[in-house]
């Protein structure tokens, strides 16, 4: 953070019942870095094996402004109009061992991702997901043509071995599906 400080505002209403071991946080509003997060959270068995559920919404914001507020350079992209609009909404459920995000709706510029994501057993995570992307033009997010470094000539196998940590990937427990309605990359379209 530039200057090592973050200016923020936080507001919420809360109700804690120790006898029933319940927690309710409503009207949650957090403002920082040009973002406004809103939501609510409910908890049960808060003094034991706590479980929480709730929803989170981040209203429309400008990602470029957030990146700059964090003191980071905005990535150089081919289309100066991208990274200008984003918003998010989701429902969550969590325990000490798992988290589940459902009704995910993430928007970035003209693209929307919807779906769900679950992580069970944090000690050895099992990740499950189902995500749907309506459309994306990857070319718009790439560096301008003149700034792309030249690609060295290597075999496909050698290039793949350098880029993908295969042994690390083999140890992962990930199962999911990503569907894309319309994809444009390298000036090619797929639907």
Language-model segments: which ranges?
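Membrane-proximal interfacial segments on either side of biological membranes
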Residues: 1-7, 11-28, 33-100, 109-191
